[in-house]
Amino acid sequence: MTDESKAAAVRKRGSRGRRRKPRDRRKKVLVVSAWTAASVAVLGGTALGVVYYKLNGNIKGVDINAALGTDRPRDIDNGSQDILVLGSDSRSGKNAKYGKDEGAARSDTAMIVHVYKGHKKASVVSIPRDTLISRPECATEDGRTDPGGQRQMFNTAYEVGGPACAVKTVEKMSGIRMDHYVEVDFTGFKKLIDTLGGVDITTKKAIRDKDSHLDLDAGTHTLDGEQALGLVRTRHGVGDGSDLGRIQLQQAFIKALLDQVKDVGLFSSWDKLYNLANDATSAITTDSDLNDVKSLASFAGGLKGIGAGDMKMVTMPIQYDPADPNRVLPLEEADQEVWDALRADKPIPKSATDKSAGDKGAVGSVVSSD
């Protein structure tokens, strides 16, 4: 592959909530927040054929296969699927209000979603952005080659080489080939939540975080897009103030968000259906195999049988870095248990996360996901 083709495949990339009485709602989720966009795109593609090309034009695609070539793990055709889902934290353009522009985008949220054979169960493995890893060599946007290196923060992979480098880094870490890539943008996420009419969250304690602009009392709230973004970005209001507490907040919010999509009554208003489809497809970047409405429809349709009780969400096993308490290190043996299980299409064993600094349940004392 030429430097030019490599470069073409790489992209750089508060207020209080209103109180509501808790509602008794049966929980059913598809899998992760990016799949919300895919689910709405399904409806948009089938019910609004007249705007099919408009929605297609919204979706941004990147050719991961062309960028990475053959330097990838073996494709195991056992009926399962693995998807890398990223939330981009670019502070440029419309996203500038959410923090200082540091010159390039980084992956603020990273999840490996494993859908088991039969598409009735799934596991989600969150990767802390502050994890120090061995980052592989990657092509950059301007055609150069970044050599990678040891003790690199995980989220710098996206900064250096966009989606292709993020996928390559995850594949080198896990030994698992990613079947798909989905990226969700800050501004698009916020707009989608507003179009949905907000998402219900119950906080058991007050959350105050000036950095994410989140200010919530204990109780049940309907979060608008701004507040929802604050919730998934907050770290100082939960647990020890690290990225680990934020990950658990994100996992709890995903369940509430997807439940809201299920119950929102999409067919009650064609205008709302179109707006949701338009917002959802505008908010995401996918691999080239998913960057049209028809492909998203097929993809999301295969996930609709997965319910809340069929999904396991964990954080990649890690430990605090003795040299820097603001960073974490992979627990290599425990991580290997996770990757081996997913590669074999098996459940993640409890022993893999028992000794991890993550998954301690701190968020359960703050936000209810029931």
PLM regions: where:
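Non-catalytic, solvent-exposed segments at the cell envelope interface
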Residues: 2-370
